[in-house]
Amino acid sequence: GALTGVMVPYGLKFLWAPLLDRYFPHFLGRRRSWLLISQVILLISLYAISQFDPVAELSTVAKIATFIAFFSATQDIVLDAYRREILTDNELGLGNTIHINAYRVAGLIPGGLSLYLATIYPWETVFLLTALCMLVGIFMTLFLAKEPMIAQVDRDQPFYMVFWIPLKEFFQRKGVAQAIGFLLFLFLYKFGDSFATTLQTKFVYDMGFEKEHIALVVKSTSLWASISAGLVGGVIMLRLGINRALWVFGFIQLITIGGFIWLAAFGHFDQIGAAELWKLGFVIAGEYIGVGLGTAAFVAFMARETNPLYTATQLALFTSLSALPSKGLGMLSGYLVKAVGYYHFFWICLFLAIPGMICLFWVAPWNEKGNEKA
């Protein structure tokens, strides 16, 4: 309904990312200035949404929520660019992993707290307290390290060039064939993995598990498995380098899809006991270990392939493209499950993970010179 398009800005952030590379206030530098602006606007917007009744004024709430999503996506663009610019290539693996895990854990605090407070306090109070959480980010932004000096985008060029030049630079730097292969890899590397998890909650329900099992096993296990794997993966990348990590972690990511195949082979559980919960926990832990490892290497690889002059634009484009399998094609998974069943669906997901691994021969060879490591 009215809330359907709220998350659209996250998929389209590459459209305004070039403006963040070209135009910026000078009081805190190219990245920190936009970061502070977006955070202040988010604080005000979260307060504003608390002033409207979500039942009687749903349309207004949806519009403000979309506005919040826009500036939240803007904050993501700037943070991605800032992180790339302050980290050396051999620090990208661990640095990006720490950021991703901090993002996950930080989301639990206002998110979990808000859900709890919603059972006690009215909507207005809950969102006001959520808005106040933004003060932490605003305070930290003021004390962030200054990003390195980078040559600025030419502001005298025609406006449309701000969108064209970052794309042109990428294709010239990589070569047309290599650039197309790289973009194809972004789409394919996590395709099978993302496709497999799009219906994860429905699959667990259909296997006979209940809401309390999802809360107890799925949510907690997936969070800590992905966080632990991401941190371990970041450290391993310091030794392996990004290219080799893509190979090793990608293979683990592929194999762990097999856990869903194994679980689906049991069919619907008539009774849920300790054995069934252990099976579920084992599969979820394995899958999210693969997710954590694969994401750590994948995000570091995308960051490494950007030009510092156009970091925001190119990273926004890369991340938007890489999200297509889960956000765009994920809607097809329901039809596929209905046609072939879960067991065969997860086999299809496993095979869909193979083309991304094949692309590694071209985009990230195992012994390529410049496969950075500490």
Model-derived regions: residue spans:
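Helix-to-loop junctions at the C-terminal end of transmembrane segments
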Residues: 12-29, 228-247, 337-338
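C-terminal transmembrane helical hairpin of 12-TM major facilitator-type secondary transporters
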Residues: 244-298
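Glycine-rich segments within core transmembrane alpha-helices of 12-TM secondary carriers
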Residues: 10-13, 93-118, 319-330
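C-terminal ends and interior cores of transmembrane alpha-helices
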Residues: 35-55, 252-273, 361
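Juxtamembrane intracellular "pre-TM" segments in multi-pass secondary transporters
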Residues: 149-181
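Short amphipathic helix-loop junctions that connect adjacent transmembrane helices
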Residues: 198-215
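Symmetry-related core transmembrane helices of the 12-TM Major Facilitator Superfamily/SLC fold
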Residues: 37-43, 125-143, 344-362
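Loop-to-transmembrane helix entry/capping segments in MFS-fold secondary transporters
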Residues: 89-98, 211-212, 308-318
